[in-house]
C-alpha cells in the first residue's frame, strides 16, 4: 500500500472569512502571551461597553495584572506544549465557541479582545487558553499604546471602514470584503511564531536582520516561484526535527541576488505554521493508517473503482462533502476547508509531474464548485500503483533534509471493510470512533452503499441486515434535513434513524403481505445472530443471485428483519392461525396415596404435574400417617388429553433382617472370644469377678444373641398417568372417583398404565376425583374454578327419567327385523323378544325425525308398515325404525324428543343453562 505523508501546515492561507479577519487584526509581531483569565464575560455586554472596559477614564488602555498572569502562563509552558502547537493541534477557546451562536455574532466586536504585549527578547508563543472578557484598570500604558497603534494603523489604511461595524455575516460580499481587509492586517501584524518557517527563496539572515521588510507589502504582490526549483518540505518531516520552533536552513545568498524578481517576495509569503491564536485548527476527519497488506472484500473485484480508492479522489470527496454540509448549515468553516483543499492541490505531485508554480493565494478560487471537485477527482490516474514511497527531489538533498517519504491515507475500500457505520449530524460532527466511521459520517450513503446493503425498517442502524433481493430505490436515501412522514415512516432530523408508525398502516398492503410467501432464509448464507452488526468478512464475496433462487412472489417483498427491538410486527408475514379444536373443561382433585408404606416420620414429597401444554411443580406436600393429598386442577382439554403426576422422594420403610447374634465362643463378660485374651487379663478377670456381675453379663449376652430387625428409610420416585379417553364417559357431567397406579421411575415404560392395575414394580395407587364438562358458549370467568364448586352447581340440574317399551321394526342390513325396544332416558336397548336375548344399545344424540314411506321400496310397504323413524347416535350411526300404525310412531317420537335434563327454578347461572341445552 502506497503511503504518502503530508502536512497541512505547509500551505499558505490568506483566504480568511469574518472570523479570520479578527484573528489577523489581533495578531501582532511583538505580543506577549494571551492572559489566561479575564474578569467578567464579554458575551453579556455590547461592543461599545466592551470597548469602554478596556480603557481608563483618560483613554489609556488596560490589560490587567501582567505579573500574576505570567505566573499562570509559565505553568503552561512547563508542560512542554510547544510541540503540540508546532504540529498543528488547536484548542477551542471560549471566544471561538461563543462566536458561532446566533445571538453573539452581532454583539461580538472585533475590538473586544486584545493580547498582552510581549517583548521581542522573550519570543514566547501564544498560550493555549484565550478567553475574551473585561479588563481591570491596573495594566501598563505600554500595552495600551501599542494596542492603540493597531487601531490607528487599521484606520489609516481603511478610512472608509469602521472596525466596530465589522460583524459576522454569511453573505458572499461581506466575506470577500473581509478577505481583502485581512490581507493587509495579516501582513501588518505577523506574530513571531510565523517567522519560524520561511519562504524557500528568502535568506534567513535577511529575514532576521530586516524585520521591517516583512511588513512592507501585502500578500497579493507575491511573485511566482520558478518551476525548476522544488518546494522545501515542512520542517517536522525532516530527520533533524526537534521539539520547539523549527527554522528551515536558509538558501545560498546568491540565489536571491542573481534573480532580482525574487527580491519582491515578501516575508508574509513564507510557509508559516498555519496557526492563529483565535482560529484553532480543526483536524480533517480521516481514517488512521492501518496495515492492509492483505486485501479483503465482500464484493466482486470487478465492481471496485480505482478512483474511489485513491488518496486524492478520497480527499477531494471528503472536502466536498464537508463544504456542502457546512455551507448548508450556515457555519463559517469555509476558510479552513479552502486552506486544506489548496494544500492538497499544491503539496502532492500528480501523474509523475512536478508543479512549476506554487500559488500562495487561495482567494482566487475561494468558492470552488462542489461538482467541479467531484468531477476532477474522477479523472485522477496513476494513484493506485504499488509504490510504497517516492523519493524527494534532488534539490532538497542540498538543504540537508535527507530522505523524506510522503505517506498516503489508507487505500482499503470503504464498501468492503468490516466497520460499524455511524450516525452523523447535519454539521458533520462525528459521534463514534471506529476505524472508518469518520469518513462514513462525512460521505453520504451513495458513496458507501453496495447493492447488497439496504436500510432495514424498524432498526436503529442504517445498515443492519443482509438483504436477499435488490434494495428498493425508494428506501436507499434516508437522509433528510427536516422531519417528514411518508407512508407511515417518520424520519428524524439526524437523517438516518427511521421509526415505523403503525397508525399509518394501510389495510390493503397488510392483506397483501399476509397472503404473500415469507422470504426464505439460507442458514449457510445469512447469519441469524442477534447482533445488529454483521461481520462483512464472514459473508461470501460472490454474487448472491447465483447462490440461490428467490421464491416466486417475493421479488418486490421486503426482507424479514432479524431484530429483537420489536419495532416491526412480524405477524404480517405469518399465516393466519387455524381454528382451535373444541376444548372441554376437565377438573381433577388429588385425594390420597394408597398401598404404599410411607414412613411415619414427616418428610416432604415433591409433586410435578406434566401436561402437553404446561409443566408445573406443586408445593412440598407434608405427608401424615393417613397419606392424604389435597390439590385441585382445571384444564382445557381435548379427547387426547393426558396428565402425569410425578412423585419424587417418597419415604418408605425398607424392613430387612439384621445380623444374628454372636457365636457361643464369645466371652460373656465383654463379648470378645476367650482365646483372644492374654493370660494376665484372664487372671485379673477371675480375681475381680463377682456373682452379680456375672448375672448381668449373661443377661446382656442373651439379648445380643437374639436377631434384631433394622428399619431403613429410603426415598423412591414414581409416576401416575391419567388419560381422559379412559374416564370421559364415566365423568361426563358428574364426579367420578378413580385409582391409578404409581409406577416406579425405572419401570415407567415397561409396564402399561391401566386403571386399578398393580404390578410388581408399582409403588402404590393414587386416588383422585375427576369431572368433565363439554365445551360451552360461555366466557371462561362464568365457569367454575374447582371440582367442588362444579359439583355444587350441578345439583341444580334435574334428570328426567324417560321410559318406553314396545315392538318396532328395524332395518338391519338388507332385511327388516321385528325387535323389542326399551327406552331409558336417551338410551335404546334392542332385544330379540320381550325378555329374550339382548342385541344392541343405541345412545340418542340428536332430535329424532319421522321418515315418509314414499322413500322406501314396495317390499317395505307390502309388510303393512305405515310410518318410519330416523334416529342418530352419539358416534354418528343412523338407525331406521318402522311402526305398523301412525299412533304408535307418534308416541315414540314424543318420548324420544323429550328433555332428559331440567334446571331448577331460580337458578340463573349461565353455564348451567348452556349445559342443560347441550345435554337436551
From Swiss-Prot:
Keywords: Cell cycle, Cell division, Cytoplasm, Cytoskeleton, Mitosis, Nucleus, Phosphoprotein
Short motif (Nuclear export sequence (NES) 1): ranges: 69-81
Intervals of motif Nuclear localization sequence (NLS): 681-710
UniProt xrefs under SUPFAM superfamilies: PH domain-like
Compositionally biased spans, kind Polar residues: 461-481, 542-561
Post-translational modification: Phosphorylated. At the onset of mitosis, becomes hyperphosphorylated, leaves the nucleus, and forms a medial ring. Phosphorylation by plo1 and other kinases may contribute to solubilizing mid1 for export from the nucleus. Phosphorylation by sid2 drives removal from the cortex at the actomyosin contractile ring constriction onset.
Ranges where the record places region Disordered: 1-452, 538-561
Segments carrying motif Nuclear export sequence (NES) 2: 763-773
GO BP terms: actomyosin contractile ring assembly; mitotic actomyosin contractile ring assembly; mitotic cytokinesis; mitotic cytokinesis, division site positioning; septin ring organization
InterPro entries the record matches: PH-like_dom_sf, PH_domain
A cellular component term, taken from the record's GO annotations: nuclear envelope
Phosphothreonine found at: 34
Molecular-function annotations in GO: cytoskeletal protein-membrane anchor activity; lipid binding; molecular condensate scaffold activity; phosphatidylinositol-4,5-bisphosphate binding; polo box domain specific binding; protein-membrane adaptor activity
Region spans: Cryptic lipid-binding C2 domain: 551-920
Chief location of this protein within or outside the cell: nucleus
Regions annotated as coiled coil: none
Positions where Phosphoserine occurs in the chain: 15, 24, 46, 62, 95, 531
Subunit architecture: Homodimer. Interacts with blt1 and cdr2. Interacts with gef2. Interacts with plo1 and rng2. Interacts with fhk2 and sep1. Interacts with clp1.
Description of its domains: The N-terminal part (residues 1 to 452) is intrinsically disordered but moderately compact and is able to demixe into liquid droplets at concentrations far below its concentration in cytokinesis organizing centers (also called nodes); these physical properties are appropriate for scaffolding other proteins in nodes. The N-terminus has the ability to associate faintly with the medial cortex and is sufficient to form tight rings. This domain is responsible for oligomerization that may contribute to the activity of mid1 as a scaffold for other proteins in cytokinetic nodes and contractile rings. The C-terminus contains a cryptic lipid-binding C2 domain and a PH domain, and is involved in the anchorage to membranes, which stabilizes cytokinetic ring position.
Protein's recorded name: Anillin-related medial ring protein mid1
Amino acid at each position: 500500500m502506497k503511503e504518502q505523508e503530508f502536512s497541512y501546515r505547509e500551505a499558505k492561507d490568506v483566504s480568511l472569512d469574518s472570523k479570520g479577519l479578527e484573528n489577523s487584526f489581533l495578531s501582532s509581531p511583538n505580543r506577549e502571551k494571551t492572559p489566561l483569565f479575564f474578569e467578567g464575560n464579554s458575551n453579556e455586554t455590547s461592543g461599545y461597553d466592551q470597548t469602554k472596559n478596556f480603557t481608563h477614564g483618560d483613554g489609556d488602555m488596560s490589560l490587567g495584572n501582567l505579573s500574576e498572569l505570567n505566573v499562570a502562563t509559565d505553568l503552561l509552558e512547563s508542560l512542554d506544549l510547544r510541540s503540540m502547537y508546532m504540529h498543528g493541534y488547536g484548542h477551542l477557546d471560549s471566544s471561538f465557541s461563543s462566536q458561532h451562536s446566533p445571538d453573539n455574532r452581532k454583539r461580538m466586536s472585533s475590538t473586544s479582545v486584545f493580547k498582552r504585549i510581549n517583548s521581542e527578547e522573550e519570543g514566547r508563543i501564544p498560550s493555549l487558553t484565550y478567553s475574551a472578557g473585561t479588563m481591570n484598570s491596573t495594566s501598563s500604558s505600554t500595552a495600551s499604546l501599542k494596542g492603540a497603534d493597531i487601531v490607528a494603523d487599521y484606520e489609516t489604511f481603511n478610512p472608509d471602514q469602521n472596525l466596530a461595524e465589522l460583524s459576522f455575516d454569511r453573505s458572499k460580499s461581506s466575506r470577500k470584503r473581509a478577505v481583502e481587509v485581512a490581507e493587509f492586517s495579516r501582513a501588518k501584524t505577523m506574530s513571531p511564531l510565523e517567522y519560524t518557517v520561511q519562504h524557500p527563496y528568502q535568506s534567513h539572515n535577511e529575514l532576521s536582520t530586516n524585520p521591517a521588510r516583512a511588513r512592507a507589502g501585502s500578500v497579493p504582490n507575491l511573485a511566482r516561484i520558478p518551476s525548476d526549483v522544488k518546494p522545501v518540505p515542512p520542517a517536522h518531516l525532516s530527520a533533524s526535527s526537534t521539539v520547539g520552533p523549527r527554522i528551515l536552513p536558509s538558501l545560498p545568498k546568491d540565489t536571491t541576488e542573481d534573480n532580482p524578481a525574487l527580491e519582491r517576495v515578501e516575508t508574509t509569503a513564507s510557509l508559516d505554521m498555519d496557526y492563529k491564536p483565535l482560529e484553532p485548527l480543526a483536524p480533517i476527519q480521516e481514517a488512521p493508517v492501518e496495515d492492509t497488506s492483505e486485501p479483503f472484500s465482500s464484493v466482486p473485484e470487478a465492481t471496485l473503482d480505482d478512483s474511489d480508492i485513491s488518496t486524492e479522489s478520497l480527499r477531494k470527496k471528503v472536502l466536498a462533502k464537508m463544504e456542502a454540509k457546512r455551507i448548508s448549515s450556515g457555519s463559517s468553516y469555509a476558510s479552513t476547508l479552502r486552506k486544506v483543499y489548496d494544500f492538497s492541490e499544491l503539496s502532492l505531485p500528480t501523474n509523475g509531474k512536478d508543479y512549476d508554480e506554487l500559488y500562495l493565494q487561495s482567494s482566487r478560487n475561494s468558492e470552488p464548485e462542489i461538482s467541479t471537485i467531484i468531477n476532477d477527482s474522477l479523472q485522477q490516474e496513476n494513484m493506485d500503483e504499488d509504490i510504497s514511497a517516492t523519493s524527494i527531489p534532488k534539490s532538497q538533498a542540498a538543504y540537508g533534509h535527507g530522505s523524506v517519504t510522503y505517506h498516503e491515507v489508507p487505500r482499503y475500500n470503504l464498501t468492503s471493510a468490516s466497520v460499524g457505520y455511524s450516525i452523523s449530524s447535519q454539521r458533520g460532527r462525528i459521534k463514534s470512533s471506529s476505524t472508518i466511521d469518520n469518513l462514513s459520517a462525512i460521505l453520504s450513503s451513495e458513496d458507501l452503499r453496495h447493492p447488497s446493503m439496504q436500510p432495514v425498517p424498524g432498526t436503529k442502524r442504517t445498515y443492519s441486515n443482509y438483504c436477499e433481493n435488490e434494495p428498493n430505490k425508494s428506501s436507499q436515501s434516508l437522509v433528510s434535513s427536516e422531519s417528514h412522514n411518508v407512508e407511515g415512516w417518520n424520519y428524524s432530523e439526524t437523517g438516518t434513524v427511521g421509526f415505523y408508525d403503525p397508525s399509518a398502516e394501510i389495510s390493503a398492503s397488510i392483506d397483501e403481505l399476509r397472503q404473500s410467501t415469507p422470504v426464505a432464509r439460507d442458514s449457510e448464507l445469512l447469519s441469524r445472530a442477534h447482533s445488529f452488526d454483521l461481520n462483512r468478512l464472514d459473508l461470501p464475496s460472490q454474487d448472491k443471485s447465483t447462490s440461490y433462487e428467490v421464491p416466486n412472489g417475493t421479488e418486490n417483498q421486503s426482507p424479514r428483519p432479524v431484530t429483537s427491538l420489536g419495532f416491526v410486527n412480524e405477524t404480517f408475514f405469518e399465516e393466519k392461525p387455524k381454528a382451535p379444536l373444541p376444548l372441554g373443561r376437565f377438573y381433577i382433585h388429588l385425594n390420597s396415596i394408597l398401598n404404599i408404606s410411607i414412613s411415619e416420620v414427616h418428610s416432604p414429597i415433591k409433586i410435578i404435574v406434566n401436561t402437553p401444554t404446561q409443566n408445573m411443580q406443586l408445593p412440598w406436600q407434608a405427608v401424615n400417617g393417613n397419606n392424604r393429598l389435597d390439590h385441585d386442577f382445571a384444564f382445557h382439554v381435548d379427547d387426547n388429553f393426558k396428565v402425569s403426576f410425578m412423585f419424587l422422594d417418597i419415604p418408605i420403610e425398607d424392613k430387612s433382617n439384621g445380623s444374628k447374634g454372636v457365636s457361643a465362643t464369645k466371652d460373656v463378660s465383654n463379648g470378645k472370644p476367650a482365646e483372644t485374651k492374654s493370660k494376665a487379663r484372664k487372671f485379673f478377670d477371675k480375681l475381680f469377678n463377682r456373682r452379680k456381675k456375672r448375672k448381668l453379663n449373661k443377661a446382656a449376652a442373651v439379648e445380643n444373641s437374639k436377631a434384631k430387625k433394622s428399619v431403613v428409610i429410603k426415598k423412591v420416585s414414581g409416576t401416575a398417568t391419567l388419560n381422559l379417553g379412559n374416564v370421559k364417559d364415566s365423568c361426563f357431567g358428574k364426579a367420578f372417583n378413580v385409582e391409578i397406579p404409581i409406577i416406579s421411575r425405572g419401570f415407567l415404560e415397561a409396564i402399561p398404565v391401566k386403571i386399578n392395575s398393580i404390578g410388581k414394580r408399582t409403588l402404590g395407587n393414587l386416588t383422585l376425583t375427576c369431572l368433565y364438562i363439554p365445551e360451552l358458549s360461555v366466557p371462561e370467568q362464568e365457569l367454575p374454578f374447582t371440582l367442588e364448586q362444579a359439583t355444587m352447581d350441578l345439583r341444580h340440574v334435574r334428570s328426567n327419567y324417560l321410559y318406553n317399551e314396545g315392538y318396532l321394526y328395524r332395518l338391519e342390513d338388507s332385511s327388516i327385523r321385528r325387535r323389542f325396544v326399551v327406552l331409558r332416558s336417551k338410551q335404546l336397548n334392542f332385544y330379540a323378544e320381550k325378555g329374550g336375548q339382548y342385541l344392541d344399545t343405541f345412545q340418542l344424540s340428536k332430535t329424532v325425525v319421522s321418515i315418509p314411506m314414499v322413500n322406501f321400496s314396495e317390499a317395505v310397504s307390502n309388510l303393512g308398515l305405515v310410518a318410519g323413524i330416523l334416529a342418530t347416535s352419539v358416534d354418528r350411526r343412523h338407525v331406521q325404525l318402522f311402526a305398523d300404525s301412525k299412533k304408535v310412531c307418534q308416541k315414540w317420537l314424543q318420548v324420544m324428543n323429550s328433555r332428559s335434563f331440567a334446571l331448577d327454578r331460580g337458578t340463573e347461572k349461565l353455564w348451567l343453562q348452556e349445559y342443560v341445552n347441550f345435554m337436551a
